[in-house]
Amino acid sequence: MQNEVQSICIVGTGFRGLGVFERIYAYAKKNRSTKPIQVHLIDPTTDGPEQYNTRLPDYLLLNIVCGQVSLFPDAVSVPGCPPTTGPSLYEWVRERRLRLTEDGFTIGDTGRDINYGDFLPRRLLGEYLLWFREVIKKEAGLLFEIFEHKAKATNIAKDAYRYAIQLSNSEVIISDYLFITVGQISEPILSSFGYKSKTKYISQPYPLPEQLETVKAEERIAICGLGLTAFDAILTLTIGRGGKIVVKNGVENYIPSGKEPQIVAFSRSGLPFFSRPSLGAPLKYEPIVFNQSAIDGLRNKVGMKLDYDRDILPLIFTEMRVAYHRAKYGRDYGWEKTQKLHTDFRYAFQTGNLEKLLNELDSHDSFVFSHKDYYFEFYDTSAMGFADSTSYENWIRRWLENDLKESRSGTPLSPIKAALEVLREFRDIIRYAVDFGGLTNESAERFFSFHSETLNRIGVGPQKEHTAIVLALMKAGILRICLGPSPEILWDNYLKYWKFSSKVFKLQQVITVDWIYQGSINRRQHIGENSSIVGAMAHQGLLRRYYPESAVNYAVDIDHNFHPINQNGIANERIWVLGLLCEGATFYNGYVTSPDKFVRSQFDADCAVSSIFSQIMQ
């Protein structure tokens, strides 16, 4: 038994799966005398995850700057075993002498050098991901056997200690340890509108541009969504069909190719995403009031389960005000002087005078930053009393113009953007408060139906350049955002078109279109309906929903070590579920890993693999 081969299966080789693979290599390198190991990598795709597919066109960009992307973990994220070292995405493209052409997105041999703060084509991240896989595979192959399976894991059988994984190509893999790192399958969003027809309905957003090739120039298409996936579709139908952006007097203008359809975009909320700001001045600092100690103090005071609106939001809003005034002070008086203000903030907090100090700073500001407006009031479009679609569309245009102005100023010169970045920079503290049942059931339901979407809208938006393109398309009459939130959708089977009717305007807007494109990833799918191994595990009782009564939370139930809980309430300690399948049991699982900082996903992988090797070495 001492020399029995230990088999580890990783189902899904995106960011999470390859993070686990790197950790297995690192631990095997450190513990050379362990039992023989086999690692099985199971994934039907060879071109990377669909959002980062290596065949994507260059105009589909990352919404994070290349200098903030790395698959190689920092030591702080992997305390159990030293990290594998290697280049960040920025260093990787520089090593290959890739250059950025004049249009701002095409990569080639000509043009300017790529900078740390550039938003690069997503296909490059896909290529970097595949390169990382090959680097780890080459080194790890000297330590253990690696088997790659270009297939889908569809079923599972379990005996006392091991698992038999059935693949779509009829292979069966016997495994001692199993990692499920696949994403959730997108549910057609029209089901949330009570309509399930697939007539001229493009229900799967990717791959692009292939999914939109059947849409003709003389047709009209409605895009369900105003976020990143919707932006991808809009760019595919315009820039991807030969349209050009020409800047005149500092304003972007769209020159059509004649191949564009007419585009109408809408969403459930009727609200756009905030665009990502230019980065510059060092805004990072230790939070004054919103930190883990504050969360622990709340739990000691009110109980282990918190109410997000009552307990956590006030801390976040105070921290946003601190960030706003800190950035404003740095802009007006120089960043070297902000440390004194930050010291004043900390002393005021310790002496119970922070609110007084913030109010005093507000009184000297001609523009009073309303954190609640940016978080709440702006987000109920149904209550704004728009007379008609024109007034709503004009509001959208002004909103985008103002946001673009702030994003171009960036965190060095926009106190508003600096304040909003709190929601992104301190996301781990939100996780600390929310994860693993940290909220009451009622609060968790509201968090995952409203707050998580608001946090994403503020912190995970498009590049400012894409917002400028949207404004240019609206001005050119190619794109309209005119229906308001959650319009009524009907299919006219006689006339063969889709009919949209606004619900919140005093004068109703009615529009007909030829096509509907699902421009958002709808992850509200019951795990039992998943066609992969996840659905099979649910049917066999190997896992269950985290909160089965929820109308918005479809996460897999896991313990604090990411082991799935079976139908009898017992953790499967040789299985780990990591990533988007946990969204609801934990918060914000779909993100790109960064260098030189703590990354929770890499920490989780380290803990899981550490536990495997502690068993193997016994």
Spell out what each predicted region is:
Residues 44-45, 55-64, 70, 77:
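Conserved small-residue
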Residues 67-70, 87-92, 207, 291-294:
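Short, solvent-exposed coil/turn linker segments
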